[in-house]
């Protein structure tokens, strides 16, 4: 256990181990992806996609390994019963830090299918990682503002098309579609700017989850409502690497999949409103849970 080392040295060791793990697994991932690209047939995809997922799971296991070696973490995880790697899941979570991604991958690795995150388009240019996300078919979203779309109406619907295309692929092999419904990491400044009605959360957005339900609603076996809390305060990624995070709380709530009406009388706006109301209730429950965590921490 290296957690007793000085923070700068610990951060250097953790960063190095993380980078070595990336440099080992990503080239393997890309090599297999190129084969799939050169042989774009369904039966090839049905063989290669599970192989890509096994490679990604091994990569995540490597991350869990260096985390165990360098971090003295107390994991308080609840609600993991009855999960299956052979089921399709829609996963939603609050978003506080880049550390959330490592936490989610560590907790769910090989317990459910690989988490597929919806990413900002700009992230495809991140060295090495952008290629890895592309190889794993994470959808890249433009996330244009409403003001921009009013000026460029020809771009309206591009994210919807990207989501539908991704979900069509995910329907072939068990997948966990992951969505941070707030769309960005929580900060006090964003919370104030939004005038969020929640104490610990930003306002959730239902657009992406509505599209996923439209495309794959019949495939999803359950919704996993995940709440992450850091009793020591929201950490930066560097603070995590340097060992400043001592405890992580993760609560998983398994919920039935909401069934949106698909009759012709329901407009897209009406369907999105129904989903938004459902999401708002999720967020109200999540905010109450985070408040109870905060009370325990102060106590």
Regions found by a protein language model. Name each.
Residues 1-89, 95, 103:
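Membrane-anchoring hydrophobic helices of lipid-metabolizing enzymes
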């Amino acid at each position: 256990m290296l957690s007793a080392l000085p923070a700068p040295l610990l951060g250097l060791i953790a960063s190095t181990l993380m980078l070595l793990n990336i440099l080992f697994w990503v080239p393997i991932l890309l090599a297999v992806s190129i084969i799939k690209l050169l042989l774009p047939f369904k039966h090839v995809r049905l063989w290669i996609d599970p192989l890509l997922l096994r490679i990604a799971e091994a990569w995540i296991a490597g991350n869990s390994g260096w985390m165990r070696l360098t971090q003295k973490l107390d994991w308080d995880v609840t609600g993991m019963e009855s999960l299956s790697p052979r089921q399709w899941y829609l996963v939603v979570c609050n978003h506080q830090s880049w550390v959330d991604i490592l936490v989610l991958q560590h907790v769910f690795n090989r317990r459910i299918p690989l988490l597929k995150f919806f990413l900002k388009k700009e992230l495809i240019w991140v060295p090495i990682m952008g290629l890895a996300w592309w190889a794993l078919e994470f959808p890249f979203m433009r996330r244009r503002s409403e003001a921009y779309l009013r000026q460029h109406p020809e771009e309206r619907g591009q994210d919807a098309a990207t989501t539908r295309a991704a979900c069509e692929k995910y329907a072939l092999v068990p997948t966990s579609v992951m969505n941070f419904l707030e769309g960005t990491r929580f900060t006090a400044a964003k919370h104030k700017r939004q005038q969020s009605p929640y104490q610990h959360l930003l306002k959730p957005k239902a657009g992406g989850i509505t599209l996923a339900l439209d495309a794959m609603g019949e495939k999803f076996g359950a919704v996993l409502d995940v709440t992450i809390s850091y009793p020591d305060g929201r950490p930066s990624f560097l603070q995590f690497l340097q060992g400043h995070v001592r405890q992580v709380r993760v609560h998983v709530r398994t919920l039935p999949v909401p069934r949106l009406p698909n009759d012709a009388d329901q407009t897209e706006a009406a369907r999105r409103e129904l989903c938004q109301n459902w999401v708002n209730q999720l967020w109200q429950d999540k905010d109450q849970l985070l408040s109870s965590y905060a009370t325990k921490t102060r106590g």
